[in-house]
Amino acid sequence: MAEMSKNPASTLKPSRYLCLTICGYRKPGMSEEDYRYHMTQVSAPMTKDLMAKYGVKRWTMNYMIRRWPSCPTLTASAKLCLRTLEDYKRMKQDPWYKEHLIGDHEKFADTKRSKMTIGWIEEWISDGKPVDGLEFKS
């Protein structure tokens, strides 16, 4: 077993990418199926090119299939990999984002309940193989 450093936090460098996680809730009265349909067929197609323009390297959605006591009403979580939080902030200031996406979110999401976390992302297995960090081709 590897020996633990006396002060491991002092020797760690941040990973190259941040992961912004958005915990999303569907609008009251909307079914989970309708939420997922709107996200995959309307919102995601409108959003993905803008995210790529502002440096998002990966965007995934996880739709809940089982409820946990810690978050019994969570509908989905979105994960965005990016280099800096500033890239995300710039995207939200884009006139196209303001004109098209803010209003779209109100059609399917309970935005008052949404929550976000941000942290460094590490990757240890990719495509079924052990790796030593997250890398993107471009």
From Swiss-Prot:
Enzyme class: oxidoreductase
Top-rank taxon: Eukaryota
Pathway stated in the Swiss-Prot or TrEMBL entry: Secondary metabolite biosynthesis
Pfam family, one: EthD
Keywords per UniProt: Monooxygenase, Oxidoreductase
Similarity comment: Belongs to the tpcK family.
UniProt protein name: Probable decarboxylase ptaD
